[in-house]
Curated annotation (Swiss-Prot):
UniProt record, GO biological process: translation
Sequence similarity: Belongs to the universal ribosomal protein uL5 family.
Record keyword rRNA-binding present: yes
Designated name of the protein: Large ribosomal subunit protein uL5
Organism per entry: Corynebacterium kroppenstedtii (strain DSM 44385 / JCM 11950 / CIP 105744 / CCUG 35717)
HAMAP family assigned: Ribosomal_uL5_B
Gene3D superfamilies the UniProt entry points to: 3.30.1440.10
Described purpose of this protein according to its UniProt entry: This is one of the proteins that bind and probably mediate the attachment of the 5S RNA into the large ribosomal subunit, where it forms part of the central protuberance. In the 70S ribosome it contacts protein S13 of the 30S subunit (bridge B1b), connecting the 2 subunits; this bridge is implicated in subunit movement. Contacts the P site tRNA; the 5S rRNA and some of its associated proteins might help stabilize positioning of ribosome-bound tRNAs.
Keyword entries, A-Z: Ribonucleoprotein, Ribosomal protein, RNA-binding, rRNA-binding, tRNA-binding
Any one Pfam family match given in the protein's UniProt record, by short name: Ribosomal_L5_C
UniProt subunit comment: Part of the 50S ribosomal subunit; part of the 5S rRNA/L5/L18/L25 subcomplex. Contacts the 5S rRNA and the P site tRNA. Forms a bridge to the 30S subunit in the 70S ribosome.
Cellular component GO terms held in the UniProt record: ribonucleoprotein complex; ribosome
Length: 184
C-alpha cells in the first residue's frame, strides 16, 4: 500500500458517519463519538486435538482472509473426556487494527456477507452491553480470497467488532451506519 492511501470505509467514517452519529446522540465532545477499535477473528479447531495437521489449514485460511499471520491458541488445561492435553493447539486468532481492520470490514460487508446463501441479515441482539458486536460464520467459502477448490473442510469463525461505544444503542448505530446488514 502506498503512503497516502486511506481505506474507503475509514474515509466514509471520518467524513460522513461521525457527523451523523454526533447529530443523533448530541455528544458534548467529538472524542466521545464511537469508532471501531479492533476486529478479532477467531477460528476454533477442536478436531486439531486428534489430528495436529488440521490447525495448518485453519492458519492458512485465516492468513488469506485477513492478510495477517494468526496466533495459535492452545488449551489452557487438560480435559480427558475430549482427549485434550494442556498446550495442544485448538484454535487460531487474528486481531486486526488500523488500516487492515478497515479493509477487512469493507471486504466483509461488501463482498463476503452478500455471498452467503439465504442470507437475511445479522441479528442485532448480539451486543455485549458495551457496544461490542460478535457474530459467527458457519463456513469460510464466502471470502473470495480463498480458492473454493483448495478448501479442505468447512470451518466456521467468530468475528468480534470492538467499538469505543459506551452502550448497545451507540454501537448498533455505528455499525448500521458502517453498513452492517442487521435484520429489521
Amino acid at each position: 500500500m502506498s503512503e497516502n492511501y486511506t481505506p474507503r470505509l475509514k474515509t466514509r467514517y471520518r467524513s460522513e458517519i461521525r457527523e451523523t452519529l454526533n447529530k443523533e446522540f448530541e455528544y458534548a465532545n467529538v472524542m466521545q463519538i464511537p469508532g471501531v477499535t479492533k476486529v478479532v477473528v477467531n477460528m476454533g479447531v477442536g478436531d486439531a486435538a486428534r489430528d495436529s495437521k488440521l490447525i495448518n489449514g485453519a492458519l492458512n485460511d485465516l492468513t488469506l482472509i485477513t492478510g495477517q499471520k494468526p496466533q495459535i491458541r492452545r488449551a489452557k488445561k487438560a480435559i480427558a473426556n475430549f482427549k485434550l492435553r494442556e498446550g495442544m493447539p485448538i484454535g487460531a486468532r487474528v486481531t486486526l487494527r488500523g488500516d487492515r481492520m478497515w479493509e477487512f470490514l469493507d471486504r466483509l460487508l461488501t463482498v463476503a456477507l452478500p455471498r452467503i446463501r439465504d442470507f437475511r441479515g445479522l441479528s442485532d441482539k448480539q451486543f455485549d452491553g458495551h457496544g461490542n458486536y460478535t457474530f459467527g460464520l458457519s463456513e469460510q467459502s464466502m471470502f473470495y480470497e480463498l480458492d473454493v477448490d483448495k478448501i479442505d473442510r468447512p470451518r466456521g469463525m467468530n468475528i468480534t467488532v470492538v467499538t469505543s461505544a459506551t452502550n448497545n444503542e451507540e454501537g448498533r448505530a455505528l455499525l448500521r451506519e458502517l453498513g452492517f446488514p442487521f435484520k429489521k
